[in-house]
C-alpha cells in the first residue's frame, strides 16, 4: 500500500499484552509501519501491573495503556478485544519476537481474500527463511476462517500474532466461543481450525 488510492479505509488496533516489557516495548511498537497503509492505526497496551517502565515507555510512543489487575494472557486479550476501537485487530507479543513490518501485508491479505482470521506460525517462517519476499511470507502465514471445521495441527501453538475482524466477536453466537478459542490457545490446547494453507 504505497499509494493513497490503495489505502484501505480501515481502522487497525494493535493489542499488546505486557508485563515487565520495558526492554522491548518501544521496538515492538516501532516495528509496525505507521505510513498510509491503513486509514488509522492505534496501539492498546493491556498491562499486567508491570513494576518497570513498560507503561511509561508505551505512553511516550503514543499508545493507549490500560492497567488490567486480573492475571492471565486470556484475560488481557479479552479485555483488549472488547476495548479495541479498530474494526481490524492485530495481536503480538511485546518482546520483538514477531515481524511487525509484515502487519500491513497481513491486513491486506485479510481484506483482499475476505478472511475473518489469520494466525501466524513463527516456526514455519524460520524453516522457510531462505525463501524470498512475499512468496516465503505467504508460505509462513496460516490463514484461518472463523469457522471451526476440523482438527488441524498448529505448528506454533504459542503464537501470539493474530489478525482478525473485530466483528466476529460482536456476533452473539460467536463471541463466547471465539473468546474461548483464543484463551485456550494460550493455554496450549489444540484448537479446531480450517486452514487455507496445508
Language-model-detected regions and their locations in the chain:
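Short aromatic/hydrophobic "clamp" motif used to bind/position activated sugar donors
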Residues: 89
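A conserved acidic beta->alpha catalytic loop
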Residues: 47-55
Amino acid at each position: 500500500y504505497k499509494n493513497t488510492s490503495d489505502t484501505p479505509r480501515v481502522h487497525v488496533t494493535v493489542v499488546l499484552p505486557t508485563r515487565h516489557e520495558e526492554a522491548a516495548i518501544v521496538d515492538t511498537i516501532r516495528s509496525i509501519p505507521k505510513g498510509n497503509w491503513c486509514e488509522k492505526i492505534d496501539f492498546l497496551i493491556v498491562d499486567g501491573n508491570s513494576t518497570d517502565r513498560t507503561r511509561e515507555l508505551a505512553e511516550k510512543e503514543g499508545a493507549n495503556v490500560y492497567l488490567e489487575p486480573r492475571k492471565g494472557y486470556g484475560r488481557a486479550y479479552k479485555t483488549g478485544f472488547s476495548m479495541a476501537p479498530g474494526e481490524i485487530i492485530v495481536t503480538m507479543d511485546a518482546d520483538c519476537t514477531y515481524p511487525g513490518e509484515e502487519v500491513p501485508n497481513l491486513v491486506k491479505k485479510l481484506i483482499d481474500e475476505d478472511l475473518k482470521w489469520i494466525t501466524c506460525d513463527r516456526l514455519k517462517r524460520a524453516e522457510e527463511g531462505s525463501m524470498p519476499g512475499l512468496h516465503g511470507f505467504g508460505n509462513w502465514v496460516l490463514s484461518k476462517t472463523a469457522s471451526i471445521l476440523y482438527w488441524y495441527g498448529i505448528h506454533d501453538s504459542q503464537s501470539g500474532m493474530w489478525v482478525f475482524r473485530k466483528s466476529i466477536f460482536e456476533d452473539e453466537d460467536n463471541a463466547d466461543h471465539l473468546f474461548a478459542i483464543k484463551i485456550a490457545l494460550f493455554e496450549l490446547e489444540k484448537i479446531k481450525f480450517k486452514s487455507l494453507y496445508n
